From Swiss-Prot:
Taxonomic classification: Bacteria, Pseudomonadati, Pseudomonadota, Gammaproteobacteria, Vibrionales
Protein name: N(4)-acetylcytidine amidohydrolase
Function (record text): Catalyzes the hydrolysis of N(4)-acetylcytidine (ac4C).
Gene3D superfamilies registered for this protein in UniProt: Hypothetical protein
Family: Belongs to the N(4)-acetylcytidine amidohydrolase family.
């Protein structure tokens, strides 16, 4: 049985968007692209490692930086220019990204 990630971290300011169900994707680089569809993952804050909620991974798809569009911004619950700026700050000079789609597990 292959192991798969069971934890994912988000900036604290994004966690209310996740727990409200507004944010349904995350864009990551290849090092964080190994999530497996139909698995449950615990969400923690990056800054304080506080558990926030659980999500179910729906899909993991390759995405180039220049393909990020209004649809992704809507799913991220952030305006497109802000989203692109944030991605560039986190992953400078990386164009090969992955979009991870998920849903909130309501307990």
């Amino acid at each position: 049985m292959s192991s798969h990630p069971t934890k994912i971290t988000f900036f604290e300011f994004l966690t209310p968007l996740i727990t409200s169900g507004q944010k349904t994707i995350t864009i990551r680089d290849e090092s964080e692209s190994h999530y497996v569809p139909n698995t449950e993952v615990e969400v923690f804050t990056l800054e304080t490692d506080r558990k926030v909620c659980d999500i179910k991974i729906l899909s993991v798809e390759p995405l180039n930086f220049d393909e990020i569009n209004e649809f992704h911004a809507e799913q991220e619950a952030i305006e497109l220019p802000k989203l692109k700026q944030l991605i560039r700050e986190i992953y400078p000079n990386i164009d090969k990204l992955f979009v991870i789609e998920y849903e909130l597990i309501k307990k």
